[in-house]
């Protein structure tokens, strides 16, 4: 689960992590009022959406007087902001964050995330802040520190010293940053985050460090332990189809291909997507119907994937274990009663009650179903139907 910058910064403040003063605004008048209340002569007017790259997309502006605050707020609020993370469809800006200015002398990058390959928590830091970290990693890898932390040991001084060394900080600056990272690490662990990112982390003329931006992503499976975090969910920022699928116990992620996938189990779903790509076609989604799929949930899955007008073929790949194949077959029939299916369906069913499922489909009146003998054959059929 992702949250907005203003929400992340409120959490930072509660945990003693330095941020600049700021207030959320839901209207132009409120934006101007917030700037007046914050005081000063420079403010940042920031679009609040669940995506990075806001500045390049025109969603972050620096105002040097209240008239500029009003002007920028009126332009950003209600705009459809397109960034490299939103996709071409963009995101509607429904709220702003008005933040006090600062005398910035240097920008850094800092993130804490879980490195699955290394089975460690990893701190990533760079002296090149305010930029695309992937570009920095490609062009100037020597400017990036990657410090692994064993969760059983936790964050220690030597971890912080390595970060300070790569960032080129002096002794006093290093002490300040290490203290800040220690608080961030504790917050990351305490709140079951997947990722905590500050880009940029700024150093002021006074030598102090502040989180100028804040991005936090939380483990959905751990939200039951953090009701105060779950309350921060902004469903307007989520894909409607993905949100609806979750309500029915389906794991759905929309992609940009033309082959819709319906699979049971995340591992098999990823393998299915891989073999579709290998065949030369492109998956339109990730869809795991889970272990408790019923005819009703399968019908709902059909309904959701058929809303994607790019879909040319549906590939159903089920290995019956907990999920019986006959349930999937009945779900297909149920779906076709309520939703008109005019595109080919490739079905590969194996495992529990696979023979019964084949009989159900053979006895149906569905003319556009093609049976696959195995996964490879299914991918080949899909590719031939996509063209």
UniProtKB/Swiss-Prot annotation:
ATP binds at residues 46, 53-55, 99, 102, 107. Gene3D superfamilies: ATP-grasp fold, A domain, ATP-grasp fold, B domain, Succinyl-CoA synthetase domains. Its EC number is 6.2.1.5. It catalyses: succinate + ATP + CoA = succinyl-CoA + ADP + phosphate; GTP + succinate + CoA = succinyl-CoA + GDP + phosphate. Its cofactor is Mg(2+). PROSITE patterns: SUCCINYL_COA_LIG_3 (PS01217). Keywords: ATP-binding, Ligase, Magnesium, Metal-binding, Nucleotide-binding, Tricarboxylic acid cycle. GO terms for cellular component: cytosol; succinate-CoA ligase complex. Substrate binds at residues 264, 321-323. One of its GO terms (molecular function) is succinate-CoA ligase (ADP-forming) activity. Pathway: Carbohydrate metabolism; tricarboxylic acid cycle; succinate from succinyl-CoA (ligase route): step 1/1. It comes from the Bacteria. Binds 1 Mg(2+) ion per subunit. GO terms for biological process: succinyl-CoA metabolic process; tricarboxylic acid cycle. Belongs to the succinate/malate CoA ligase beta subunit family. Succinyl-CoA synthetase functions in the citric acid cycle (TCA), coupling the hydrolysis of succinyl-CoA to the synthesis of either ATP or GTP and thus represents the only step of substrate-level phosphorylation in the TCA. The beta subunit provides nucleotide specificity of the enzyme and binds the substrate succinate, while the binding sites for coenzyme A and phosphate are found in the alpha subunit. NCBIfam families: PRK00696.1, sucCoAbeta. This is Succinate--CoA ligase [ADP-forming] subunit beta. The gene is sucC.
